[in-house]
A protein has these predicted regions:
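Juxtamembrane amphipathic/hinge helix adjacent to a transmembrane helix
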Residues: 227-228, 237-291
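A structural motif
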Residues: 146-164
Length: 335
């Protein structure tokens, strides 16, 4: 374990510019994906030079975002995600200088952001709002039938994850929003007039919370209940606006940190960006070629399964009128 950590740290130091693979920009954000945005902000807070590559191949893939550096790749679905990987491997840890007596508060605050606020955001994105927001982030590059099926599947999965049924929908909605508002209240008191949540230096909790706030303020519609709750806390909104200028101004002026190049593959890749040439070692190139074959096979399998899903869906729903299908998406329950 120590040897692996040492190797990863050495690869990180040796690579002049890292590559963050994320979903595409939208809503004035360098990546509109609520999972990718905190990873990007964490790297910016740590002043890490990196380029952004956009992945559009697998809208339901859970390994995105990921960071490439040297021969190493930190995937979102491994070791707790990109941020946790960088901390665990002692590569980039913004909490290392935090006083030890602050750790209990940091962990409880992080849990609140990762549960109450994350649940509320998922609820609004997939259950409450219309399909346009998720469409822009995940499905706009897919054909209409596949995009619609994937959105329906994700909505169903989120409702199951949050324990929402037709019988308890109103009760669960009240609970989700009550917890989110309580979280905003606690975070507002925690932030106060400080620069960051835990003093004058950022932590991973700041990156997670800032990603949440920027998404809510920029991506969710004006009718969003979550957005209206957040806007009641001026210091939280001001914090987000200030950090957006400091950390994301480069994206609005030049299109990204060095580069924001599109990628049609979810395969870890090396490319050229801003004059930087990424040339993997011969051995690494051979390993990546084998991985690429697997990813291409996965692509074919993905497309085939989605085609079958569309055909099955059309057969099942062939006798159902469109308004009824829309009701299923809108999730408007009647007593």
């Amino acid at each position: 374990m120590a040897s692996a950590a040492t190797t990863a740290a050495a690869e990180w130091e040796a690579e002049a510019r890292k590559v963050l693979v994320a979903r595409k920009p939208a809503f004035g954000l360098p990546t509109a994906c609520p999972t990718c945005l905190p990873a990007l902000l964490y790297l910016r807070m740590a002043k890490v030079p990196f380029d952004i590559h956009v992945d559009t191949s697998f809208p339901d893939a859970d390994h995105i975002p990921y960071v490439e550096f040297g021969e190493c790749v930190a995937f979102n679905n491994e070791k707790g995600g990109v941020i946790e990987y960088l901390k665990e491997e002692k590569i980039v840890d913004l909490t290392s200088n935090l006083p030890s007596d602050s750790y209990p508060d940091l962990l409880s605050t992080k849990a609140m952001v990762s549960t109450w606020l994350a649940d509320a955001l998922q609820y609004e994105l997939w259950v409450v709002t219309d399909r346009s927001v998720a469409q822009d982030i995940y499905f706009s590059d897919l054909s209409w039938p596949i995009g619609k099926i994937l959105h329906w599947k994700k909505t169903r999965d989120v409702k199951q994850l949050l324990g929402i049924t037709k019988l308890n929908a109103a009760e669960r909605e009240d609970e989700i929003y009550r917890k989110a508002n309580a979280a905003y209240d606690a975070l507002s008191m925690r932030l106060g007039d400080q620069a960051f949540l835990f003093g004058n230096s950022p932590t991973d909790v700041d990156a997670l919370f800032l990603g949440h706030v920027l998404f809510v303020l920029n991506a969710l519609p004006g009718t969003s209940t979550l957005r209206s709750y957040l806007q009641n806390y001026d210091n939280l909104v001001n914090f987000a606006e200030r950090m957006k200028v400091q950390l994301l101004a480069v994206d609005s002026s030049s299109g990204g940190s060095g580069s924001s190049a599109p990628s049609s593959s979810s395969m870890p890749r090396k490319g050229t960006s801003s004059g930087q040439s990424y040339k993997p070692k011969p051995r690494a190139k051979k390993e990546r070629t084998e991985e690429e074959k697997k990813f291409r096979q996965r692509t074919k399998y993905f497309l085939a399964t989605q085609l079958v899903a569309v055909l099955v869906f059309l057969l099942i729903m062939g006798g159902v009128d469109s308004p009824e299908l829309d009701d299923e998406y809108d999730v408007e329950y009647e007593d």
